[in-house]
Amino acid sequence: MRTTISQLKEMKQNKQKIAMLTAYDYPTAQILDKAGIPAILVGDSLGMVVLGYDSTVSVTMEDMLHHLKAVVRGSQKAMVIADMPFMTYHLSPEQALLNAGRFMQEGGAQAVKLEGGVNVADKVKRIVDCGIPVMGHIGLTPQSVNQLSGFKVQGKTLTAALALLEDARALEKAGAFAIVLETMPAELAAMITAAVSIPTIGIGAGENCDGQVQVVSDMLGMFTDFVPKHTKKYADLNGIISKAVSGYVTEVAKGEFPTLKESFTLDKKVLEELKKCVSSEQ
């Protein structure tokens, strides 16, 4: 049985923090699921951390569906939430509904996530009205990074802070079951969390959100080029993997791998007969 919306709402009511991580493949989903993560986000961040794009803007529905299916297959208990890519819900509520439906029918997701507040409330309502759960996302919205002039903290002025509060209320009214609050002052995130009855999931939004989400590649230390301020590295997989690969290369070069332990052998009788056959052909 997977985590339900009701369970997430109960966690907020009971002041139990919600832990969420991204996953993009089968083995990672298995690990997260066994570790007890209640919710897994198949984020469009895969464009940057898996596919090597400069931003999430280039990610397509096909990209997302490919990875979503793997994560669903690799998990049994976690709610799997699929990120709706850039320009897959912006044109109309009908477009949003059709693409959200693909994630549910083809990908096996339990919910979808989309970026925006007041400006996407009509899309959220249309999707929810047809029975598809929606998670909102406000603050720093990566798909709008060009309009926002880069990855910058949002809501730092009175006007901007009030606009984000309005966005959160609009998403709740439209039927969203939770909202991601990204890269905003902790005080503002706390106010938004108190202002809505649905769970808030923070990423760079302080400790007072109802839960937290991180990009799994960041928190596991897969990359050394850039580590977001809001990320805590719980492991150094980049170093561990690099050391392992270097060891493999060295052992192969020296003829130390594989050994008899990693090899398969013929029955002695078969081997002798094979040698006779080969020698008779020469």
UniProtKB/Swiss-Prot annotation:
Mg(2+) binds at residues 44, 83, 115. 3-methyl-2-oxobutanoate binds at residues 44-45, 83, 113. Its cofactor is Mg(2+). It is an enzyme of class 2 (transferase). Binds 1 Mg(2+) ion per subunit. It is found in: Cytoplasm. InterPro entries: Pantoate_hydroxy_MeTrfase (IPR003700), Pyrv/PenolPyrv_kinase-like_dom (IPR015813), Pyrv_kinase-like_dom_sf (IPR040442). It catalyses: 3-methyl-2-oxobutanoate + (6R)-5,10-methylene-5,6,7,8-tetrahydrofolate + H2O = 2-dehydropantoate + (6S)-5,6,7,8-tetrahydrofolate. Its main location: cytoplasm. Transmembrane segments: none annotated. GO terms for cellular component: cytoplasm. The active site is at residue 182. Pathway: Cofactor biosynthesis; (R)-pantothenate biosynthesis; (R)-pantoate from 3-methyl-2-oxobutanoate: step 1/2. The keyword Phosphoprotein does not apply. One of its GO terms (biological process) is pantothenate biosynthetic process. It holds the Pfam family Pantoate_transf. Keywords: Cytoplasm, Magnesium, Metal-binding, Pantothenate biosynthesis, Transferase. Its EC number is 2.1.2.11. One of its GO terms (molecular function) is magnesium ion binding. Catalyzes the reversible reaction in which hydroxymethyl group from 5,10-methylenetetrahydrofolate is transferred onto alpha-ketoisovalerate to form ketopantoate. Belongs to the PanB family. HAMAP family: PanB. Homodecamer; pentamer of dimers. This is 3-methyl-2-oxobutanoate hydroxymethyltransferase. The lineage of its organism: Bacteria, Bacillati, Chloroflexota, Dehalococcoidia, Dehalococcoidales.
